Curated annotation (Swiss-Prot):
NCBIfam families according to UniProt: hisT_truA
Active site (UniProt): D51 (nucleophile)
One Pfam entry name: PseudoU_synth_1
Family indicated by similarity: Belongs to the tRNA pseudouridine synthase TruA family.
GO biological process, one term: tRNA pseudouridine synthesis
Gene3D superfamilies noted in UniProt: Pseudouridine synthase I, catalytic domain, C-terminal subdomain (3.30.70.660), Pseudouridine synthase I, catalytic domain, N-terminal subdomain (3.30.70.580)
Protein name (Swiss-Prot/TrEMBL): tRNA pseudouridine synthase A
Length: 264
């Protein structure tokens, strides 16, 4: 049988999602815990591989097993055998043609900036910090130039292995919640560092270095060297993954923390 899981994790202490030799990864910790519950080696497939220091509230994985367990065993059992900064949020049996990555129709990320003169203490590893003034309205205006099917070469990491830089960006909203500026972005898929590179460029607009129209020029230039610096990893969250309704996956609050599902 095939089981899908919803996963939440704080990526601070991990070298990214993907299992690697000699370093800690979220995937490795999850697979070890699931293997204990299943009493056989378990290998998971994920919706999206996040980089070192990046967090997730809406990661989705699937794995195959021939053992019969109640769904609560996969949630409670896995959580009992994992570090406290990783948690299974839900479990559901799915058809054999479900695939966490290839069945997904869209991914959604949120980037959180603590916009205050002084750095945060409690949330220091869960948000990015920018001390100067940011105009979130101009950042939002700039972001609208990126909507639709576009070549995102200007926002693509130099070592990105994707065969194509083209992606369909479905929405990009920038909102302020007190001292927190949130960039909410959804696309069918993302090239490597795309969200963080877009964020770095929007910050240049927000602090008045560039006008909103600069983002349109940057997109058309297709040159990573012209864009802003890559924003830090700690502010980024994979918050949601869309799948066809036929799979009937659970809907849970995407967060993180206090943030509602819809930001206006």
């Amino acid at each position: 049988m095939r089981i899908a899981l919803g996963i939440e994790y704080n990526g601070t202490n991990y070298f990214g999602w993907q299992r690697q030799r000699e370093v800690k990864s979220v995937q490795e910790e999850l697979e070890k815990a699931l293997s204990i519950v299943a009493n056989h080696p378990v290998e998971v497939q994920c919706a999206g591989r996040t980089d070192a220091g990046v967090h997730g509230t809406g990661q989705v994985v699937h794995f195959d097993t021939n053992v019969n367990r109640k769904m609560v065993a996969w949630t409670m059992g896995a959580n009992a055998n994992m570090p406290s900064d990783i948690a299974v949020r839900w479990a559901k049996e799915v058809p054999d043609d479900f695939h966490a990555r290839f069945s997904a129709t869209a991914r959604r990320y949120r980037y959180i900036i603590f916009n205050h003169a002084l750095r945060p203490g409690i949330l220091n590893s869960g948000v990015s910090h920018y001390h100067g003034e940011l105009d979130e309205k101009k950042m939002h205006e700039a972001g609208q130039y990126l909507l639709g099917e576009n070549d995102f070469s200007s926002f693509r990491a130099a070592h990105c292995q994707s065969l194509s830089p083209c992606r369909n960006l479905m929405h990009l909203n920038v909102t302020r919640h007190g001292d927190y500026v949130v960039i909410d972005i959804k696309a069918n898929a993302f090239v490597h560092h795309m969200v963080r590179n877009i964020t770095g460029s929007l910050i240049k607009v927000g602090r008045g270095e560039e006008k909103p129209e600069w983002i349109k020029w940057l997109l058309e230039a297709k040159d990573r060297k012209l864009a802003g610096a890559t924003a830090k990893a700690e502010g980024l969250y994979l918050v949601d993954v869309d799948y066809p309704e036929e799979f009937e996956l659970p809907c849970v609050p995407i967060g993180p923390l206090f943030l509602p599902d819809n930001l206006n």
